[in-house]
Amino acid sequence: MNSEASGILKHARNLLDPEQKRSSAIAGGFAWWGRDIRTEAVISSLPDQPPIFRIGSDMWKGFEGSLSDMALLSSILKDSTLSAPARMKTDPTRIGLWVDIPLDQEKGSWMAGFLALVAAQQNAEAARFARIGHAWKADNCNLGSNEGIVPSPYAEIETELLTGLGRRDSLFGKDVGLIAEQMESESLFNVHAGIHGVSAEVNLGSQTALLRFLTKQPHPRLGNGLFCFLTIPLEADPSLAMRMNELGLGLVNPIYGPGSWCVGEVGLTHLSFYPNAIYRDGLSSWVVDWSVQRARWIVDVILGTVLGGTVGTSGGRNLPLYQSLIEIYRGEHATP
């Protein structure tokens, strides 16, 4: 391992240490390069000011799904608020996005270190797993082979900090019962807990959305953890998935948690993954809360619009996206 990688690894270990409750001056940067894509996540601070977690991406058009995922991933810090709205800039060939998140110095420093690593791994180096036309099949995780992946210059960091822990059985497996209980308390129906995880349904009027938490399905690079799927009965179109991501970025009250809308085999699917490296007591409860919030947002998108709700700019709503959702919904459920 070269000296640069060794230094980053040492710093990342400190950030991932759950016993580290306070840090008055966090400084570190992580960058990965993949195929036509570069992603950076930087943690920095100034004296007497709270640390800032800055996550940014600059890439060729065609990887917009990963771009949106970066901002969604950055919002995982539940106790943080965006210091400014997600800012997107465009030109004829490139797209960029940066999000700054102030970190509570009493909480979350280990989370920030994890994010800096996983943001790069899940979105940059593994760009072919982006949610637009690649091998990603959300509903059965048929992620294909590793053909075409560019090795990370910091592969040893990934191996030690993330993949190593991923070789263990899912640490989230012990929370399956708690996840099921929380889903029942959220008034979801047909809640079922089994050896592979938990599933439940969300009422969408004449149809339902399916919410699943799987602990037996490993990530192809990060190993075991917790996969979360929210599948809705809309056409699984990559452009619609991208617009769903854009709408999510524009919400005045953001929905926390990493992930991205993608193409599933039975419908449009929001997919997120939490590897063993991030596991802490209580995290599963947060994950359920974020997922239920997203499901209720979908109810508002589909039912609130299709069944007579108003459409406007409140809450970051985007009229063209809502119109496309209405058209697809009506087409899928038209009476013969």
Please place each PLM-identified region on the residue numbering.
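Unusually extended, aromatic-enriched hydrophobic runs near protein termini
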Residues: 141-156, 248-253, 312-327
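Intrinsically disordered, low-complexity coil segments
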Residues: 63-69, 105-114, 218-223
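Charge-rich, low-complexity N-terminal segments
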Residues: 1-42, 78-94, 105-112, 127-216, ...
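Well-ordered alpha/beta subsegment
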Residues: 84-120, 124-138, 256-293, 297-311, ...
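Hydrophobic, helix-prone linear segments
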Residues: 1-68, 75-81, 282-290, 294-336
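Short, surface-exposed, charge-dense and proline/glycine-enriched linear segments
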Residues: 51-60, 116-126, 163-169, 220-231, ...
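Hydrophobic-cavity lipid-handling domains and compact docking modules
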Residues: 27-63, 196-238, 243
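Short, internal acidic amphipathic alpha-helical interface segments
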Residues: 54-98, 223-275
